[in-house]
Amino acid sequence: MSFEISRKQYTDLYGPTVGDSVRLADTELFLCVEKDYAAIGEEVAFGGGKVIRDGMGQNGTLVRDVDIPDTVITNVIVLDYTGVYKADVALRDGKIFRIGKAGNPNVMENVDIVIGVATDIIAGEGKILTAGGIDTHVHFLGTDQVNTALASGITTMIGGGTGPSQASMATTVTPGQWNTYNMLSAFEGMPMNFGILGKGHGSSKSPLAEQVRAGAIGLKIHEDWGATPSSINTALEVADDMDIQVALHSDTLNEAGFVEDTIEAIAGRVIHTFHTEGAGGGHAPDLIRVAALPNVLPASTNPTLPYTRNTVEEHLDMVMVAHHLNPDIPEDVAFADSRIRAETIAAEDVLHDMGIFSITSSDSQAMGRVGETITRTWQVADHMKRTRGSLTGDAPYNDNNRLRRFIAKYTINPAIAHGVDYVVGSVEEGKFADLVLWDPKFFGVKPDLVIKGGLMVNSLMGDSNGSIPTPQPRTLRNTWGAFGQAVSRSSITFLSQDAIDANVPDLLNLRKQIRGVRGVRNLTKRDMKLNAEMPDIRVDPETYQVFVNGELITSKPAETVPMARRYFLF
């Protein structure tokens, strides 16, 4: 005999199912569940009077070695570049083990995931699960950046620096073997995945290559060190030899050449361009053109995202401080002013919406905010829906195409750009279990739970002296997986394969998991998931207006943004 309940009652019990829509935070963006792995009437849920009990939803006889997961997240909505669906997600040995239907095959049919005695349960009903974010543009200045980023949903930080030196504040570079070794050692106690960018400036390949052998997973070229065609070519030659990425902050002042000269120096080799719009630095006024090239993986940094009525005004002082400029020197002021063009900033959001710009990142404390990359990515998506309407294929209360495009910008695409997508960047079986669980009304703003390597490392928790977990103030705090030797299980240090071959982990007694970067030099723009468009892009040299395939591309500055004051007191 079948039993019927209302759709609302079902949603209250097990979360939304196929055809249901969910608003993300206070935006105009809605996800719509496309598939549900659950068998209706056979759902598993944990709690008093519920299903996951010995002999019911839990198998009480099988030992862990018989493919029993360590943790199952039940009835959760997965939002990933691969799709929008509802499932039970099993974690085992720090990886995503299986995605499907959980339960006990002794009493249930079509069970993909067997819940056993060894299995912990995280209730995902009504929640959204995403991959942990990946920030590829981090200036390693202060250690507090790590917790700030983690509490925003970022689980991998790639960048450079040695602390608050002037060069680190400006250039995202960890120079030389000694500094690289020290930073790799410092990463050991932090619940975050890390990768280091070395200095990509040298007249010969040897001093660049030694940084890669020391552990750098990429080389950074920055105009403050001189982004010359010679530096670009030498860095790319080393990258081709050692299968690493080159990140480029190009020549704002056009000292050593114009954008055409930089394109010529790159010579068709893959490169990851930072703040490709140009306000963060790069050939004035037309760096943005490189986003059309098949060998360029173009990124934005978050201070220009989205374009608002305050964006231009805040940037002048930001440039002056970040690049050690003197406001009393007219040439320094002119340099800063040349980087800030409302016309190209206005085009940037649209280029993201069209899938031309592929990646978002922070530029932490150096013209960017390390805890806002995820929030600002979704603010852009919201602003674009409000001003440009739905994307092709989307519908009322269904923005899945736009959502998949935008989530790819801070998950899978940065992972691909740095050769770590075989480990992190998506919710797929076999990947390292770096996952973020969100309450929809706080989506993109404040996570409920951050999981790293299958361990809970940061969580929304109430007063620790409370009789229950929920008394105010509820704040995001590090939990057990972020402490002691658990950090070595929950987190990864990414190294070049040359550094692994040189036994750097043993030399430094690194205890974190080690993974090598790979497959970087074979990449093209076509590898950027859902963000691989390559139209003709032109910039008017007098008005700075941006044209895509001959059509003017611009947007009005937002007067207000979602995911802002409603969620933050400060």
UniProtKB/Swiss-Prot annotation:
Heterotrimer of UreA (gamma), UreB (beta) and UreC (alpha) subunits. Three heterotrimers associate to form the active enzyme. It holds the Pfam family Amidohydro_1. Carboxylation allows a single lysine to coordinate two nickel ions. It comes from the Bacteria. Transmembrane segments: none annotated. Binds 2 nickel ions per subunit. Pathway: Nitrogen metabolism; urea degradation; CO(2) and NH(3) from urea (urease route): step 1/1. Residues 132-570 form the Urease domain. InterPro entries: Amidohydro-rel, Metal-dep_hydrolase_composite, Metal_Hydrolase, Urease_alpha_N_dom, Urease_alpha_subunit, Urease_asu, Urease_asu_c. It is found in: Cytoplasm. Ni(2+) 1 binds at residues 137, 139, 220, 363. The active site is at residue 323. The modification N6-carboxylysine is found at residue 220. Gene3D superfamilies: Metal-dependent hydrolases, Urease, subunit C, domain 1. HAMAP family: Urease_alpha. The keyword Transport does not apply. This is Urease subunit alpha. Its EC number is 3.5.1.5. GO terms for molecular function: nickel cation binding; urease activity. The keyword Cytoplasm applies. One of its GO terms (cellular component) is cytoplasm. CDD domains: Urease_alpha.
